[in-house]
């Protein structure tokens, strides 16, 4: 099963974890972005550049992802869509989305959008830290182990 990465917003340290995993596991990782990406040479890494525009990369991932694939994204609506197709969604902080958590996250996202639209400054998520990176690597390893069975 391939791995799809919403690469425009994916932190560099997470991409580096994915680059190493792709070669180690000989698993195809496709990074989808609306800008040029520089990736190390590997027959297991592929970039897919899409046109600039709102949700163009997300729509490409939804179109291509299949049941059992892994999608790396912090975009909650994208995660919800690929999960409807049977794909697994994992965010760069190592949280594997479930049906229950995705509903909760969509509700919170909509609430925060409403707050921002009314002029409230909500700030963004905290910076990615070493614990987040380790959690991501652990969840990725769990998924990779499941693929070996």
UniProtKB/Swiss-Prot annotation:
Similarity-based family: Belongs to the UPF0178 family.
Pfam family, one: DUF188
Transmembrane portions of the chain: none
HAMAP family, alphabetized: UPF0178
The protein, known as: UPF0178 protein ETA_25650
Cited InterPro entries: UPF0178 (IPR003791)
């Amino acid at each position: 099963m391939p791995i799809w990465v919403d690469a425009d917003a994916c932190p560099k340290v997470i991409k580096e974890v994915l680059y190493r995993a792709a070669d180690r596991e000989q698993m195809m990782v496709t990074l989808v972005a609306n800008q040029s990406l520089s990736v190390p040479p590997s027959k297991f890494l592929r970039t897919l550049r899409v046109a600039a525009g709102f949700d163009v990369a997300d729509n490409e991932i939804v179109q291509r992802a299949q049941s059992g694939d892994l999608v790396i994204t912090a975009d909650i609506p994208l995660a919800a869509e690929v999960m409807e197709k049977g794909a697994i969604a994992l965010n760069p902080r190592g949280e594997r989305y479930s049906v229950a958590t995705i509903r909760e996250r969509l509700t919170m996202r909509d609430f925060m959008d409403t707050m921002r639209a009314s002029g409230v400054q909500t700030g963004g998520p905290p910076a990615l830290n070493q614990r987040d990176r380790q959690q991501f690597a652990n969840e990725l390893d769990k998924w990779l182990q499941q693929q070996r069975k």
